[in-house]
């Protein structure tokens, strides 16, 4: 019997386990909290065909020992893709990565294709593994697949028909030796693409432009600011000379969503979707939860949940769309440069409530740029911050309360979804 080891029983690991067991593999599960520990697993490495590492697990001593023994390390994405090839599945993969905007783009491309009459779904770093989707959903025309840099580290055969990198900004410095290593890992999404396949290229992004020339796939350019295959001019989206839609008719608002929309339009044009169907969809598409989500009004006081903002660039977009708001910010310390965040807050934010283990560092950066002490409230967590606001604000307070943390949630929460859910529940409890 063929044998494989799975390290980490999260969404990816569970999906890979189910798929491989269906294919007759004996699976050894290693999970320091739920199954065999990594220390015990050292005695079970003989005879493995390969080793699957969950994306969130770093290259720790156990993984390095697996590497040292010459055992092939794969990700769940590679396992699932190989399964598709072996079974002769005709489903096409549209692969999406980027620092920000990838979840919205992934989900909305799937919705757009369904609206156009195809059978499509989404998978990947968006709550459902590719393996799970392949086992449960049959006869799909397309899978819109969100990929994090972690999921792209061990690509061998994976080859999407369309790939895209929405944008690249500093993130995950705790995982990679340098930002260059992080950026280059993102480009593994194009590694096996050939001239008959497509890469959608954001020519507004300097880091993408630096690396795009090495890509073999046909490049389709998008831009918010200059001429491209898909571009914005005079508040309209164009494909070459063809007017696709007025920007003010888009249901997804904000400069960040305009960028996401350009990738949707590029995908639609590559696949030759009916333009009227495309236009219809762009006028009714709804935003995802936890992404600049206005979810509650307490009289004039508005609450926006942007818990998905797990890096500085993402919070920048939220601040640009909600200037002069009161910001709740902070969380896990990812080791990134906080000076740009401090400048952004100084220029655009009325007051800031700092939470999480990174609060002191943000406060120090704010003081360096001259942000007034009386505008900084350091109250440890979301609940304390909201309780303080309840004492200060009434239904007549014409303010926007924006949760946009600029970092990960792992110091106090299980995920950004958990953080956003708790924020919404606390707002309703305290102000509802």
From Swiss-Prot:
Intrachain disulfide bonds: none
Keyword ATP-binding (UniProt): yes
Keyword terms, alphabetized: ATP-binding, Cell cycle, Cell division, Cell shape, Cell wall biogenesis/degradation, Cytoplasm, Ligase, Nucleotide-binding, Peptidoglycan synthesis
Gene Ontology molecular-function annotations: ATP binding; UDP-N-acetylmuramoylalanine-D-glutamate ligase activity
Biological process according to GO: cell division; cell wall organization; peptidoglycan biosynthetic process; regulation of cell shape
GO cellular component labels: cytoplasm
EC code: 6.3.2.9
Entry-linked InterPro entries: Mur-like_cat_sf, Mur_ligase_C_dom_sf, Mur_ligase_cen, MurD
Cell compartments where the protein resides: Cytoplasm
SUPFAM superfamilies per UniProt: MurCD N-terminal domain, MurD-like peptide ligases, catalytic domain, MurD-like peptide ligases, peptide-binding domain
Main location: cytoplasm
Classification via Gene3D superfamilies: Mur ligase, C-terminal domain, Mur-like, catalytic domain, NAD(P)-binding Rossmann-like Domain
Catalytic activity line of the entry: UDP-N-acetyl-alpha-D-muramoyl-L-alanine + D-glutamate + ATP = UDP-N-acetyl-alpha-D-muramoyl-L-alanyl-D-glutamate + ADP + phosphate + H(+)
Binding site for ATP: 98-104
Pfam families given in the database record: Mur_ligase_M
Metabolic or biological pathway, per its Swiss-Prot or TrEMBL entry: Cell wall biogenesis; peptidoglycan biosynthesis
Superkingdom of the organism of origin: Bacteria
Primary role: Cell wall formation. Catalyzes the addition of glutamate to the nucleotide precursor UDP-N-acetylmuramoyl-L-alanine (UMA).
Family to which the UniProt record says this protein belongs: Belongs to the MurCDEF family.
Protein name per the record: UDP-N-acetylmuramoylalanine--D-glutamate ligase
UniProt source species: Fusobacterium nucleatum subsp. nucleatum (strain ATCC 25586 / DSM 15643 / BCRC 10681 / CIP 101130 / JCM 8532 / KCTC 2640 / LMG 13131 / VPI 4355)
Name of the encoding gene: murD
């Amino acid at each position: 019997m063929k044998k494989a080891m799975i390290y980490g029983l999260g969404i990816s690991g569970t999906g890979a386990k189910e798929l491989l067991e269906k294919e007759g593999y004996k699976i050894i599960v290693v999970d320091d909290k739920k199954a065999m520990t990594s220390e015990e697993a050292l005695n079970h490495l003989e005879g493995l065909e390969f080793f699957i590492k969950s994306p969130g697990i770093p290259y720790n001593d156990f993984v390095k020992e697996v590497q040292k023994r010459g055992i092939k390390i794969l990700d769940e994405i590679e396992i699932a893709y190989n399964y598709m090839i072996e079974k002769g599945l005709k489903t096409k993969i549209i692969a999406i990565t980027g620092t920000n905007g990838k979840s919205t783009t992934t989900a909305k491309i799937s919705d757009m294709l369904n609206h156009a009459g195809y059978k499509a779904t989404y998978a990947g770093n968006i709550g459902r593994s590719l393996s799970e989707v392949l086992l449960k959903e049959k006869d799909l025309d397309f899978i819109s697949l969100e990929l994090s840099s972690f999921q792209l580290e061990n690509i061998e055969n994976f080859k999407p028909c369309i790939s895209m990198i929405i944008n690249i900004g500093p993130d995950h410095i705790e995982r990679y030796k340098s930002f260059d290593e992080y950026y280059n890992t993102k480009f593994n999404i194009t590694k096996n693409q050939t001239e008959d396949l497509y890469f959608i290229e954001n020519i507004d992004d300097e880091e993408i432009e630096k690396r795009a020339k090495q890509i073999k796939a046909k490049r389709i350019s998008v831009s918010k600011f200059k001429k491209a295959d898909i571009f914005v001019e005079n508040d309209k989206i164009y494909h070459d000379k063809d007017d696709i839609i007025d920007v003010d008719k888009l249901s997804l608002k904000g400069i960040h969503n305009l960028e996401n929309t350009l990738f949707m339009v590029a995908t639609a044009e590559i696949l030759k979707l009916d333009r009227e169907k495309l236009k219809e969809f762009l006028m009714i598409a709804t935003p995802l939860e936890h992404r600049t989500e206005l979810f509650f009004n307490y009289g004039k006081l508005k609450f926006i949940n942007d818990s998905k903002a797990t890096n500085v660039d993402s919070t920048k977009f939220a601040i640009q769309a909600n200037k002069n708001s009161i910001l709740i910010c902070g969380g896990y310390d990812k080791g990134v440069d906080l000076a740009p965040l401090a400048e952004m807050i100084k220029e655009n934010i009325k007051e800031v409530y700092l939470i999480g283990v990174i609060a002191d560092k943000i406060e120090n950066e704010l003081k360096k740029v001259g942000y007034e002490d009386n505008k900084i409230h350091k109250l440890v967590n979301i609940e304390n911050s909201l309780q303080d606001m309840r004492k200060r604000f009434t239904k007549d307070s014409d303010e926007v309360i924006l949760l946009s943390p600029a970092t990960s949630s792992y110091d106090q929460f299980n995920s950004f979804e958990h953080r956003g859910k708790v924020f919404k529940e606390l707002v309703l409890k305290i102000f509802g």
